[in-house]
C-alpha cells in the first residue's frame, strides 16, 4: 500500500519535472506560466489526496476500508493517467510546432552566416 502511494507520488513528480522542462521552448512566457501553474496545482492536489489516502489513523484495517482506499487510489491513478495523456498530447503539438519552426530557423541561420562571411571576406 505505502509503496503504491510512493510510486504514484514519484509519477506525479516526474510529470511535473517533464512539464517544467517543456516550458523552455521559446513560446510565450505567459502561456508557459499558466501551464506550469496548472500543473503545479494538479500535482499538489494529487499529492494531497495521496497523503489523505495513506493516513490510517481513522480507518480500521477491515477489508471494506482497504477496498475503499484501493478505489480511491485507482481513481487517483486514472486522473493521473488522464493528466499524463493530456501532457503527452501537448508535447506532441509542441513537437509539431517545432518541426514547422525549424526550417525557418535554419534559413535565418544560413542568412546570418552568409552575412558574416561577406563582412569578413
Curated annotation (Swiss-Prot):
Its main location: secreted. Residues 1-22 form the signal peptide. The keyword Secreted applies. Disulfide bonds: none annotated. It is found in: Secreted. Keywords: Amidation, Secreted, Signal. One of its GO terms (cellular component) is extracellular region. Residues 23-69 form a propeptide. Expressed by the venom gland. The modification Methionine amide is found at residue 120. Pfam families: Latarcin. Belongs to the met-lysine family. Shows no antimicrobial activity against Gram-positive bacterium B.subtilis B-501 or Gram-negative bacterium E.coli DH5-alpha at concentrations up to 20 ug/ml. Shows no toxicity towards insect (S.carnaria) larvae. This is Met-lysine-1b. It comes from Lachesana tarabaevi (Spider).
Amino acid at each position: 500500500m505505502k509503496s503504491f502511494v510512493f510510486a504514484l507520488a514519484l509519477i506525479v513528480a516526474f510529470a511535473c519535472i517533464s512539464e517544467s522542462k517543456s516550458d523552455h521552448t521559446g513560446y510565450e512566457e505567459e502561456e508557459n506560466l499558466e501551464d506550469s501553474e496548472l500543473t503545479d496545482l494538479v500535482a499538489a492536489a494529487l499529492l494531497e489526496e495521496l497523503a489523505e489516502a495513506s493516513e490510517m489513523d481513522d480507518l480500521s484495517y477491515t477489508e471494506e476500508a482497504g477496498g475503499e482506499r484501493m478505489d480511491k487510489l485507482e481513481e487517483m491513478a486514472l486522473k493521473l493517467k488522464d493528466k499524463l495523456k493530456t501532457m503527452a498530447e501537448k508535447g506532441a503539438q509542441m513537437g509539431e510546432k517545432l518541426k514547422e519552426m525549424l526550417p525557418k530557423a535554419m534559413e535565418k541561420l544560413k542568412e546570418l552566416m552568409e552575412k558574416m562571411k561577406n563582412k569578413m571576406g
